[in-house]
């Protein structure tokens, strides 16, 4: 087998591989000899079929198997033998001339093919001692736990029907149909909708106009969708809702005790508080980690500047762009609504893709040098966590999909590996803990945001794409935005 380099430009490579006709013939004859004792051909005793007769019958199909074997087995070894790592699966280029292909299958000529690929650049790992990050720490006060426990208790609160007028805090059961300019709009209708007045679950002004109504009342509610409403075709428009009040209920006494916890399936109020505290600490801990990770990645980004494989960048960009356009479409928004243009957004997201690929290569090299791995046990735990995100009736199907799909498992392994590399780095760099308030921790850190973000990144439609690839900014938990309300839920 002869290997000749025909292109070496930047990260791009093309090599020509020539397998002499004699080598192809030897591989074919080995297959024919092996098949001689296995095939059954009328007129011949088992094991007595002449090789040349076998060649006449099976020669081309066996030679095709030889070709596939060479392509499958030699591609990786050839590139590894050159001391290179391919960024993606190499493109295999073979002759398109039918006569030439026939000669190869007949064993009458050398087999030539080309491999077209990009290499992973050599990355020299730098000293980490100069990297310094600040870790914001929020000590969750008891008052925070008390507030959340109260919200949990309120969600389980009982209501009793009443005959009087609805007041703030009462719950109403309503049917409604929303209209704009006299025409009903998609997602603007509901039946037997339970609504606690004052909960701000519906768009501003809706609940206020139902105060004072009684069961059996019909009420026309007029509201204006907020200018920043997620469904752009509804934003800023006035709408009327024909509402039928079917029932008014008053809340029962709010009790926060062991009995409340037992009604929620827990043994005691103390256990409920433990669970709530754990959830809150995990939430804020996740926010703390994402901010630390962002600082770390920003400094790594500044420290490493090299050409990244264009095909990896293209693949990453396509993933980001698909997510962004899906989110925009789902929200009924356009790039103009996001205060940008498609051209500007493409340029910004391309820079984001370049950054992600470059940082991914740096983290992979750091992890490899440090011996970071994801164990089978860790992958199994990650798989179970992923499967639990599916509806109960789909979990077994999802589990089988991951178990039988190596690419899906690798996609699950990659972010786990990245997080372990980040953990490794946090043990190597200077980390200073600073106690902050809840507001400081939850505040968007504009100064720390990467310059590779697109303008839509500050909008809801683009945030999912930012967080999806475990980049430097995770979507932080925020209070549900007022405009995103039930009255137009399906229209968003």
Swiss-Prot record:
Cited InterPro entries: PPIase_dom_sf, PPIase_FKBP_dom, Trig_fac, Trigger_fac_C, Trigger_fac_C_sf, Trigger_fac_ribosome-bd_bac, Trigger_fac_ribosome-bd_sf, Trigger_fact/SurA_dom_sf
GO molecular-function term, one example from the UniProt record: peptidyl-prolyl cis-trans isomerase activity
Entry-linked SUPFAM superfamilies: FKBP-like, Triger factor/SurA peptide-binding domain-like, Trigger factor ribosome-binding domain
Basic and acidic residues biased stretches: 463-479
GO BP term, pick one: cell division
Alphabetized UniProt keyword annotations: Cell cycle, Cell division, Chaperone, Cytoplasm, Isomerase, Rotamase
Cellular compartment(s): Cytoplasm
Region called Disordered, residue ranges: 441-492
Chief site of localization: cytoplasm
EC number: 5.2.1.8
Superkingdom of this protein's organism: Bacteria
Cellular component GO terms, alphabetical: cytoplasm
Top-level EC class as recorded in UniProt: isomerase
Domains (record comment): Consists of 3 domains; the N-terminus binds the ribosome, the middle domain has PPIase activity, while the C-terminus has intrinsic chaperone activity on its own.
Function as written in the Swiss-Prot or TrEMBL entry: Involved in protein export. Acts as a chaperone by maintaining the newly synthesized protein in an open conformation. Functions as a peptidyl-prolyl cis-trans isomerase.
Family label: Belongs to the FKBP-type PPIase family. Tig subfamily.
Classification via NCBIfam families: tig
Protein's name according to its UniProt entry: Trigger factor
Source organism of this protein record: Mesorhizobium japonicum (strain LMG 29417 / CECT 9101 / MAFF 303099)
């Amino acid at each position: 087998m002869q290997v000749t380099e025909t292109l070496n430009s930047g990260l791009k490579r093309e090599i020509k591989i020539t397998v002499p006709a004699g080598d192809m013939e030897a591989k074919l004859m080995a297959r024919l000899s092996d098949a001689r004792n296995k095939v059954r051909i009328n007129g011949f005793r088992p094991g007595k079929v002449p090789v040349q007769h076998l060649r006449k019958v099976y020669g081309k199909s066996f030679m095709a198997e030889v070709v596939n074997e060479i392509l499958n087995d030699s591609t990786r070894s050839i590139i590894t033998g050159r001391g290179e790592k391919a960024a993606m699966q190499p493109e295999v280029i073979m002759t398109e001339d039918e006569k030439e292909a026939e000669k190869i299958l007949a064993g009458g000529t050398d087999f030539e093919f080309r491999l077209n690929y990009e290499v992973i650049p050599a990355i020299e790992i730098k000293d980490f001692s100069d990297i310094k990050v600040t870790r914001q720490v929020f000590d969750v006060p008891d008052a925070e736990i008390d507030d959340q426990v109260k919200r949990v208790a309120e969600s389980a609160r009982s209501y009793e029907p009443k005959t009087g007028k609805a007041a703030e805090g009462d719950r109403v059961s309503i049917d409604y149909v929303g209209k704009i300019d006299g025409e009903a709009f998609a997602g603007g209708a509901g039946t037997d909708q339970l609504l606690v007045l004052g909960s701000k679950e519906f768009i501003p002004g809706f609940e206020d106009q139902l105060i004072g109504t009684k069961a059996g009342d019909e009420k026309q509610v007029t509201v204006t969708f907020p200018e920043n409403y997620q469904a752009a075709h509804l934003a800023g428009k006035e709408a009327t809702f024909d509402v039928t009040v079917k029932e008014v209920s008053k809340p029962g006494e709010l009790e926060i005790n062991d009995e409340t916890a037992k009604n929620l399936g827990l043994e005691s109020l103390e256990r409920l508080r433990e669970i709530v505290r754990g959830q809150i600490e995990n939430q804020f801990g996740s926010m703390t980690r994402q901010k630390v990770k962002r600082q770390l990645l920003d400094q790594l980004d500044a420290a490493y500047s090299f050409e990244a494989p264009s095909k990896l960048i293209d693949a990453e960009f396509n993933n980001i762009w698909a997510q962004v356009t899906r989110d925009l479409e789902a929200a009924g928004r356009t790039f103009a609504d996001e205060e940008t243009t498609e051209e500007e957004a493409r340029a910004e997201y391309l820079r984001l893709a370049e950054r992600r690929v470059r940082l991914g290569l740096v983290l992979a090299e750091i992890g490899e040098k440090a011996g970071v791995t994801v164990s089978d046990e860790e992958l199994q735990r990650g798989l179970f966590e992923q499967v639990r995100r599916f509806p109960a009736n789909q979990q077994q199907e999802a589990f089988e999909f991951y178990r039988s799909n190596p690419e899906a498992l690798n996609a699950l392994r990659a972010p786990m590996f990245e997080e372990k590399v980040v953990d490794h780095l946090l043990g190597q760099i200077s980390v200073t803990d600073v106690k902050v308030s809840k507001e400081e921790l939850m505040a968007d850190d504009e100064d720390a945001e990467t310059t590779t973000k697109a303008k839509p990144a500050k909008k809801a439609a683009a945030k999912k794409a930012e967080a999806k690839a475990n980049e430097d900014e995770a979507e932080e938990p925020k209070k549900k935005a007022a405009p995103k309300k039930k009255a137009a839920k399906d229209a968003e």
